[in-house]
């Protein structure tokens, strides 16, 4: 998924329809390339650790640590400075990289839930890192959505939603 996110972020046009440069897109691509690239390596580190029995982890292996978890939090704090506070849940929609980030977050949350079942066999910082990672993916998704000028799709609770699809179809037919 992370490779797909990088691919999709690189597909974003650097120019407006009028030919002008979109500087914000370069920033998004730069953040995606460096942050997602680092994340791919960190996930390989994490996978290597989880593939080993706890008492058989090689001494030379560099493990995910508190510094890695803290870095995710620092990056989230930086992006959050530009974001408006949440007023509703956000539905997973959006163009290429944004949709892929929503999917990556879902997969990460699933990983976190399954890791709870083996919590006694893993270091606490590993579960903390995965928890922060899912939050990090969410905040990055919101930040990229903002930077690209796209809209977030907010959840509308039952009772506050517009008519159903069938009702809208009936209205459209009546107006023809």
What are these regions (language model features)?
Residues 1-176:
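Phosphate/pyrophosphate-binding loop motifs in nucleotide- or prenyl diphosphate-using proteins
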